[in-house]
Regions:
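ATP-hydrolysis module of ASCE/P-loop NTPase motor domains
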Residues: 96-176, 393-432
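Accessory N-terminal region flanking or inserted into the helicase ATPase core
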Residues: 2-30, 38-39, 55, 122-205, ...
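Conserved helicase motor core of SF1/SF2 NTP-dependent helicases
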Residues: 28-34, 38, 61-64, 203-206, ...
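P-loop NTPase Walker
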Residues: 1-97, 500, 505-506, 543-546
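Conserved two-lobed SF2 helicase motor
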Residues: 83, 182-186, 190, 495-503
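Conserved interdomain hinge at the start of the Helicase C-terminal
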Residues: 308-329
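Core RecA-like ATPase module of SF1/SF2 helicases and allied nucleic-acid translocases
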Residues: 34, 63, 86, 272-275, ...
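Conserved P-loop NTPase-based nucleic-acid remodeling module centered on helicase motor cores
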Residues: 55, 60-143, 351, 357-363
Length: 565
């Protein structure tokens, strides 16, 4: 992986060794698939060798990126690796977080209610960067997001809309009265009061820096001035969290000497046929770091579908996707907004095609096969594990298994009176004997259950499907269909289809990408303008295109509200 080496741009081996009289900042620009994480890992190891394991601080926008770096077996303590919010939270002594304590606010402000956040989720960057056009929470959530955006861009209050200023005053009063800091305060107070980065590092690394807003990058740079040097790893072309206040300018300004900029130019993901349209698209933006960026040496394909829109994905789109899945390829379906994926999800469910979104595990709509104690797939596996057709790993039921799948059965005609109350009292790890079953089930239901063991495992699935309670009937259909069509292990196997918004899969890749070019009304208004609003839309679709390793399908737009790709 080579950077520019033409005498102007810097090279990876020079990091930390250049003249620091102007700045100690280095920037690594990593276009899609160029191995930014690999290079950053190498730089962290170099810094540890030079300064020691206690002299390095690594920060990233999200916990997912921090975890990816941590997974590279870095020679630093886990508490030196985390999101910027997490580092600030600990540096400020672990204050109470306002977004986690909104009960009083919701009582006093019924028209501006907020959804309480989980502290660790937000500190880990989990809900930062939810998609534009996604289903927002309550009215107060929207107001707080707007306020945080204006603050993050470091625009003085007199430049804010009046409604944001008014909300800001009430929110500040609430925080002061209850001794709380919100997530934006963590950065703002650290910028004001914490002069040196936590643990006094000699070298600071900021990954995913294009996702940080001006205030966050100002803090990194303030801390960086007191380090020997610091590295900002980013791709300004992938700045797509504009709704959190992230802008390319925050990364690109102030300018730094050319020999402090390193550009990773060789993509190991994007083939020529995808690279061409992606570059034509991104070159339309008004502000970017010019990059010499090369496709991987493979032709690939860019196919424009003549029919099949997000509202009618069944035939051309899903049929071709099935052909790719049969060849063992991974497939990703991407749209600008969550609502555009609803018809597709309905078709995937109807056809029993397993799908997930590993980048947004908290979204149940995109992850209907999530495992976990009490989840539908775990109950179905607990049911099937004793059947001779289960295959490897077949074993007799334990009382714990029995409790999982029997809990959702309807009582009438199936379970004896009081059976559900008995279930939790059985020792969970003991085998469920025929005597146990006889004590729980009505005779006819038990006979039908035992008969299923003489046939295919699907007959056991059908026995359960017909007897679950009405309250869970709808919920169990898709996982049951998956097990029926593909076998029990399909509930455990990682699905080869990913469904999500472009925002949700940033950093991800698949062999084949289906990209819906449609825009919401708001995004279309942005796209029709010039400058930053239009640029934000273009960058979003550039990110969508460049997830593809082999082939991208540009689907038919549903209307004229679309991006020209």
């Amino acid at each position: 992986m080579h950077a520019h080496d033409d005498g102007t741009a810097g090279s990876l081996s020079d990091i930390g060794a250049r003249d620091h009289s102007i700045t100690a900042e280095y920037r690594i620009f990593g276009p899609p698939g160029t191995g930014k994480t690999t290079n950053l890992t190498r730089q962290i190891r170099r810094a540890v060798e030079r300064f020691g394991a206690d002299s390095v601080l690594v920060t990233s926008f999200s916990r997912a990126a921090a975890a990816e770096l941590a997974g590279r077996d870095l020679p630093i303590d886990p508490d030196r690796l985390g999101t910027l919010h997490s580092h600030c939270y600990h540096a400020l002594g672990g204050p109470e977080i306002a977004e986690c304590h909104v009960d009083e606010w919701n009582k006093d402000n019924p028209h501006l209610q907020m959804t309480p956040k989980k502290k660790h989720g937000r500190l880990d960057g989990e809900d930062a960067g939810e998609d534009e056009g996604s289903e927002r929470g309550k009215e107060g959530d929207e107001c707080l997001e707007q306020l945080s955006r204006w603050r993050g861009m470091m625009i003085p209050p007199e430049g804010w809309p009046a409604v944001v200023r008014e909300f800001s005053g009430r929110w500040r009063e609430y925080k002061d009265a209850h001794g709380l800091l919100d997530f934006c305060d963590l950065i703002e107070v650290a910028l004001r009061d914490v002069y040196v980065a936590p643990k006094h590092p000699s070298v600071i690394f900021a990954d995913e820096a294009q996702d940080l807003n001006r205030m966050q990058l100002t803090l990194i740079r303030k801390w960086g001035e007191r380090a020997s040097y610091f590295i900002v790893a980013a791709d300004d072309d992938q700045t797509i969290y504009s709704f959190t206040g992230a802008t390319p300018e925050a990364v690109l300004d102030p300018d730094i000497p050319a020999d402090h900029k390193i550009i990773l130019k060789q993509s190991y993901r994007v083939p020529r046929a995808v690279h061409g349209p992606a570059m034509r698209l991104i070159k339309q933006v008004t502000r970017r770091q010019e990059k010499d960026y090369l496709p991987r040496p493979a032709e690939g394909e860019c196919i424009r579908l003549s029919s099949g829109t997000y509202k009618s994905p069944e035939y051309f789109i899903v049929k071709t996707a099935l052909q790719h899945l049969e060849r063992g390829q991974t497939v990703m379906f991407l749209a600008a907004c969550g609502y555009m994926l609803q018809p597709l999800v309905a078709v995937l469910r109807k056809n029993a095609i397993p799908f997930h979104n590993p980048y947004r595990k908290s979204n149940g709509f995109w992850n209907p096969l999530r495992m976990g104690r009490g989840s539908t797939p775990s109950r179905i596996l607990a049911l099937l594990v004793a059947h001779p057709g289960f295959g490897n790993g077949r074993r007799d039921w334990t009382n714990s298994d029995l409790g999982l799948w029997a809990e959702w059965l309807t009582s009438e005609g199936v379970l004896k009176r009081g059976a559900k109350k008995k279930l939790p009292n059985y020792p969970p790890n003991d085998s469920a004997t025929i005597g146990t079953l006889d004590g729980l089930f009505e005779t006819a239901a038990l006979e039908a259950l035992l008969t299923t063991f003489e046939g295919d495992y699907r007959s056991l699935l059908e026995w359960w499907r017909k007897r679950v309670t009405a309250s869970v009937f709808k919920r169990v259909q898709f996982p049951l269909d998956i097990a029926d069509a593909h076998g029990p292990t399909a509930l455990i196997d990682v699905p080869r289809v990913v469904v999500g918004t472009i925002h949700s899969v940033k950093g991800g890749e698949a062999d084949v990408v289906y990209l819906f070019p449609d825009l919401s009304g708001e995004a279309d208004r942005q796209y029709q303008k010039t400058g930053p609003p239009r640029d934000a839309v273009i960058r979003q679709f550039y990110v969508g295109l460049t997830r593809a390793r082999e082939c991208v399908y540009i689907c038919q737009p549903e209307s004229s509200s679309r991006v020209a790709i």
